[in-house]
A protein has these predicted regions:
Chain B
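Iron-sulfur-associated redox domains of electron-transfer enzymes in respiratory
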Residues: 1-147
Length: 362, 147
């Protein structure tokens, strides 16, 4: 038996694009405990709603996180629409969901790449990111931005996508599918990847429920919960929505779930692009939220359920805006998964929760 | 600048950015933009790095980390502030926890603007940084000879 040592992990670490600090209490090669410390990206955005107009804050909301940027602007806009009782046109709902699913594709492919980097497969990392560029090109073509889009506004969306471009969406995504399946083969069928990830960082279903984990991280532990199945907005018009879960509860299962969700998102976009109704893309929103009015809303972000709460005070500035982001839910699960793991597996486990520290700390 | 006398290695740190600039820094290193063709490699070790890419507006908590990474880098070194937040604080400039710009913490040589910064702007910034790196290393050598 060796003696206990504390190994600091982060905030600056090559596997993490974002800073989080973990104190790993280590005995020999085994991690006894992982203590996360956060605060490196805290900016205080929830305080900003008091000084910004509710229309202006949507641009701040979008910059809560650069990976789930579209999801945050959509979630915030939906919350304010509920707060003020605005009903948006059907076409705007469809466009929002199409973009949101597209951002899920880009986020999951990005994550697959980072995961490949974490288990030391750099060529796979590069292939994933090459594929992701083609998704970003679609974003750039329709919104003008690659990661920050500024396309959602309270009451609808700023830009329309015409028929030709929607057809191009479908064509490009169909083209991506083949290459994507090849990449997935490397992730899911390669024995070296399997040996590295299977049985690592197991969280049983009961623990996942007890720790209130969300998103693909929870679904990989066989928790059947996805906000999309509630059918908010254009999700309600889907002919079929099947939850993707896995029973393995380990790092391999998390990869499996995310890999399948990309294909699911492509199918959702294809279906909605065929069904999209004609009409306006926005309604004018006037006035201010009533004093004391409250609204809440939840949305399935690429990383899991994100919950929004807003309270008005009769002026154009909101009284309170609160978000509960998926990663803050999942950090507890990460600390549990790290207990008893090998020190070499730490970066793998940290990555499989798909940490988005910018969301968490705001 | 005709040719680069050195293949620079870069180190990247997210000092309270929204993540958008960070994934663009990584995207610049990946096949879409591929800065590796200029010999630029991302490293995790400050002692190996020549160019420090900082994103984000720096807050009270991570200012010490930014300073530490900068101090650990070996001379000559160049700092590139990537994104509007890193240049001036950007949209977060009036947040209570934000110091506002990387230049409040460490000396910055090149400012690459954009929200989020485009990979082209990062590449342009790094190419400018290469010129500055050359000058700094010449000055360093001259000082040694003089001493």
């Amino acid at each position: 038996m060796g003696q206990k040592t504390i190994i600091p992990f982060g905030p600056q670490h090559p596997v993490l694009p974002e800073p989080i600090h973990l104190d790993l209490v280590v005995e020999d090669e085994v991690v006894l405990e992982a203590v996360p410390q956060i605060g490196f990206i805290h900016r205080g955005l929830e305080r900003l709603v008091r000084t910004k107009d509710y229309n202006q804050f949507i641009y701040v909301a979008e910059r809560i996180c650069g990976i789930c940027a579209f999801g945050h602007s959509m979630g915030y806009a939906e919350t304010i629409e509920k707060l003020m009782g605005v009903e948006i046109p059907k076409r705007a709902e469809y466009l929002r969901v199409i973009w949101h699913e597209l951002s899920r594709i880009h986020s999951h492919i990005l994550w697959l790449g980072l995961a490949a980097d974490a288990f030391g497969h750099e060529a796979l990392f590069m292939h994933c990111w090459r594929l992701r560029e083609r998704v970003l090109d679609l974003f750039e073509k329709t919104t003008g931005g690659r990661v920050i889009f500024s396309v959602v506004k309270v009451g609808g969306v700023n830009r329309d996508i015409d028929r030709g471009t929607l057809d191009e969406f479908v064509r490009v995504l169909e083209g991506i599918k083949d290459e994507y399946n090849q990449i997935c083969n490397a992730f899911l069928k390669d024995p070296s990847v399997y040996n590295r990830t299977a049985g690592v960082g197991v969280i049983p279903t009961e623990d996942a429920l007890g720790l209130s984990m969300v998103g693909p991280f929870a679904r990989a532990s066989n928790v059947n919960y996805d906000v999309r199945m509630l059918g908010n907005g254009a999700y309600g018009d889907l002919s079929d929505f099947k939850l993707i879960t896995s029973e393995n509860c380990d790092c391999y299962a998390r990869m499996e779930v995310r890999a399948a969700e990309v294909v699911q998102s492509i199918e959702i976009i294809e279906e909605l692009a065929a069904k999209i109704p004609d009409g306006d893309i926005a309604v004018p929103v006037k006035g201010a939220p009533a004093d004391g009015a409250e609204a809440c809303n939840s949305l399935e972000q690429p990383r899991g359920e994100c919950y929004y709460f807003a309270k008005g005070n009769g002026t154009k500035n909101l009284e309170r805006m609160r978000m509960r982001t998926p990663t803050s839910q999942n950090l507890a699960g990460m600390a549990v998964a790290l207990k008893g793991c090998d020190i070499a597996d730490v970066n793998m486990i940290v990555l499989t929760i798909d940490p988005c520290i910018s969301c968490t700390e705001r | 600048m005709g040719y680069a006398t050195k293949s620079p290695w870069v180190i990247h740190y997210d000092a309270s950015s929204c993540n958008g600039c960070d994934i663009e820094v990584l995207a610049a290193l990946c096949p879409g933009f591929d800065v590796e063709r200029f010999g630029i490699i991302n490293t995790g070790n400050p002692k190996h790095a020549d160019i420090f890419l900082v994103t984000g507006s720096v807050n009270e908590r991570n200012i010490s980390v930014v300073k530490q990474i900068y101090d650990q880098m070996v001379e000559p070194k160049v700092v590139v502030a990537c994104g509007t937040c890193a240049c001036s604080g950007g949209i977060f400039h009036d947040c209570y926890n934000v110091i506002g710009g990387v230049d409040q913490a460490i000396p910055v040589d090149v400012y690459a603007p954009g929200c989020a910064v485009r990979p082209e702007a990062i590449i342009d910034g790094v190419v400018q940084a290469l010129g500055i790196l050359d000058e700094k290393s010449k000055a360093l050598k001259a000082a040694k000879r003089g001493a």
